[in-house]
Structure formats: C-alpha cells, structure tokens
C-alpha cells in the first residue's frame, strides 16, 4: 500500500494551483474595477434623484426660509457658517431663495455629511461642488475619477427667484466620457 503522494502528483497539484492563481489575479481586479464604476454611477443617480426631490417645493413653502435648514441633512452648516456670496445667513437660508452657486454646495453637503466616499480613494468625498464647497475634495477642473460634481451650468434671477441649470457630472472610469445630467432649476415654480 502506498501512503503518500509521488513527486509528480505534487507537482501537478502545484501547477494547477499556479494556473488558478494566475487566472484569479487577472480576473479579480476587473471585477473590483467594475464594482467601483457601479458605485459612481449609483451615486450619480442618487444625486439626480435627491435634487429632483427638492424641485417644485418652493411654490408650496415660498417664504419659509428655514425649511431647507431644518430638513436638508448638512444644510444647517452650509447656511449658517458659509457666506461666500457676500450676504448674511438670514438672507439666504433655504432652497427657495438661495443662489444656485450656493445651492449646489448645500446639495453636495447632504452627501458629504452622510458619508459619501470616492470608491477609488476613500479619503476623498464622493460628491462635491465645482466651486470647492466641501471638505478638501476641491478640484478646479472638476474631473477627478470617482467624484460626482454638482456644477452650476447657468444661473439667473435674484431675490427669491433664482433659476438656471445644474450639471451633474460623474467620472466613473479612466478614459471614458463622464456621465452628465443637466437639470433645470427654477425657484419661481
């Protein structure tokens, strides 16, 4: 009776393990890259959905300046501490009467406060405003892989009547064109 493996049998097993490891080493990074792309695409979809959820609410609550400050996660900090637009916080304290160039910060802040991370680099936020509104994830050219940007494409109006377009831009894969969604915004509605 034989009580072990021959050298040839052991070499065959080692060769099979080596082949499987080589195949796994080439397949696994592709699977991980695909998962990261899906996370960025999902974040893009969530940003679009979140902004859409705030559309049209101004007509229902026009003049209720604190609505966003009390209902939008992360908005309180944006509204009470950041006044880069030159106004005082009480002048611009809600979705209905906020310039789009500040509103994009408020929307991005919602995702920052809720822990959105860049799947390609988890030390960076996953959603940001082009005007560099939150944390240190500030890119002047707004094209960093894994980040979804809430940019302001156009803005008009004043007082309680700001309107224009947001451009949601997500860079999900090196060398690929970004996902872009242009969203009209009209506080007059």
Where are the model-predicted features located?
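N-terminal single-pass transmembrane signal-anchor helix
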Residues: 2-29
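Intrinsic disorder/low-complexity segments enriched in polar/small residues
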Residues: 3-4, 43, 47, 125, ...
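Membrane-proximal N-terminal amphipathic helix
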Residues: 33-63
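Periplasmic/extracellular, small/polar-rich flexible segments of pilin-like filament-forming proteins
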Residues: 56-189
């Amino acid at each position: 009776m034989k009580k072990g493996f021959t050298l040839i049998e052991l070499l065959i097993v080692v060769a099979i393990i080596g082949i499987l490891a080589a195949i796994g080493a080439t397949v696994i990074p592709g699977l991980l890259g695909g998962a990261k792309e899906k996370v960025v695409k999902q974040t893009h979809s969530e940003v679009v959905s979140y902004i859409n959820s705030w559309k049209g609410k101004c007509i229902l609550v026009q003049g209720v300046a604190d609505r966003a400050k009390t209902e939008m996660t992360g908005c309180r900090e944006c509204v009470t501490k950041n006044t880069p637009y030159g106004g005082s916080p009480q002048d611009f304290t809600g979705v209905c009467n906020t310039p789009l160039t500040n509103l994009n910060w408020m929307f991005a802040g919602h995702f920052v406060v809720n822990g959105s991370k860049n799947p390609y680099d988890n030390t960076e936020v996953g959603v940001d405003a082009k005007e560099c509104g939150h944390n240190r994830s500030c890119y002047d050219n707004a094209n960093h892989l894994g980040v979804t940007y809430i940019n302001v494409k156009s803005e008009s109006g004043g007082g309680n009547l700001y309107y224009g377009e947001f451009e949601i831009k997500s860079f999900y894969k090196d060398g690929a064109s970004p996902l872009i969604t242009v969203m009209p915004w009209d506080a007059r509605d």
